[in-house]
């Protein structure tokens, strides 16, 4: 990757390093330029889909959505000002992904939808009782009111 950079790009990068004191961050694409142990750390972080579960503390994911190596010489500078952060903020949290089978997810979604309907602030459980009563017993009663049944009483 380094060899593909234009001289103008390299000059801009050197100027930025002098100005802000930030060294070029080795990304996954050009990690081959690093020492063997740092290269191994990058390879471990990039090699598997479960890398988020066991990432070395020197590897982190920035805004570019790409894993990169945090060099010990890297200073915490942003726009020339040193930012003090606790170490635990810089470390990545372990991801505990809860993976449910599809029927279980659907069941949970339906249950939460029903609960959200019943727990509206303007409607209590008792408010729904008359509607449930009507919808349960009214259709069979309306089936009785057919033309033949009604005409029997009218004639």
Swiss-Prot record:
<feature type="region of interest" description="Disordered">
    <location>
        <begin position="1"/>
        <end position="34"/>
    </location>
</feature>
<dbReference type="GO" id="GO:0016020">
    <property type="term" value="C:membrane"/>
</dbReference>
<protein>
    <recommendedName>
        <fullName>Putative uncharacterized protein RPP38-DT</fullName>
    </recommendedName>
</protein>
<keyword id="KW-1133">Transmembrane helix</keyword>
<feature type="compositionally biased region" description="Basic and acidic residues">
    <location>
        <begin position="8"/>
        <end position="22"/>
    </location>
</feature>
<keyword id="KW-0472">Membrane</keyword>
<keyword id="KW-0812">Transmembrane</keyword>
<feature type="transmembrane region" description="Helical">
    <location>
        <begin position="115"/>
        <end position="135"/>
    </location>
</feature>
